[in-house]
Amino acid sequence: MSPFKKTYVLKLYVAGNTPNSVRALKMLKNILEQEFQGVYALKVIDVLKNPQLAEEDKILATPTLAKILPPPVRKIIGDLSDREKVLIGLDLLYDEIREREAEDQ
């Protein structure tokens, strides 16, 4: 692995401290700790407390997970319990596979 790993910047938009919000955050933290130890920054945004941020980022439903960096911006809306779908949906799994293939050559 390259010593210069990229950092993933993610935003999780939730609506208060509801069971769905708590579950989404727990599942996401689990995925990130397993797959991206130390190479991610996660900001949790409560759209009830910060509706202007949700409006600026065009968030229509919660929970919504947005990958901000590296580009392109990708979003997943709803259930975050399927690890593989989250990684593929955000292009995170694809990036890791591509990097491993490049290292093997």
From Swiss-Prot:
Keywords on record: Biological rhythms
Entries under SUPFAM superfamilies matching the protein: Thioredoxin-like
Origin: domain of life: Bacteria
Annotated CDD domains: KaiB_like
GO MF annotation list: identical protein binding
Aminoacyl-tRNA synthetase as UniProt keyword: no
Pfam family, one: KaiB
UniProt record, GO biological process: circadian rhythm
Disruption-associated phenotype: A triple kaiA-kaiB1-kaiC1 deletion grows normally under photoautotrophic conditions in continuous light. In a light/dark regime has strongly restricted viability and impaired growth behavior, and overall decreased pigments (after 5-6 days); phenotype is more extreme when grown on 0.2% glucose.
Family: Belongs to the KaiB family.
Biological function: Key component of the KaiABC oscillator complex, which constitutes the main circadian regulator in cyanobacteria. Complex composition changes during the circadian cycle to control KaiC phosphorylation. KaiA stimulates KaiC autophosphorylation, while KaiB sequesters KaiA, leading to KaiC autodephosphorylation. Phospho-Ser-431 KaiC accumulation triggers binding of KaiB to form the KaiB(6):KaiC(6) complex, leading to changes in output regulators CikA and SasA. KaiB switches to a thioredoxin-like fold (KaiB(fs)) when bound to KaiC.
Domain notes: Has 2 forms, fold switches to a thioredoxin-like fold (KaiB(fs)) when bound to KaiC.
Assembly and binders: Homotetramer in solution and crystals formed by 2 dimers. Only elutes as a homotetramer in size exclusion chromatography, interacts with KaiC1 and KaiC3. The KaiABC complex composition changes during the circadian cycle to control KaiC phosphorylation. Complexes KaiC(6), KaiA(2-4):KaiC(6), KaiB(6):KaiC(6) and KaiC(6):KaiB(6):KaiA(12) are among the most important forms, many form cooperatively. Undergoes a major conformational rearrangment; in the free state forms homotetramers as a dimer of dimers. When bound to the CI domain of KaiC switches to a monomeric thioredoxin-fold (KaiB(fs)).
HAMAP family: KaiB (MF_01835)
Protein name: Circadian clock oscillator protein KaiB1
Species of the source: Synechocystis sp. (strain ATCC 27184 / PCC 6803 / Kazusa)
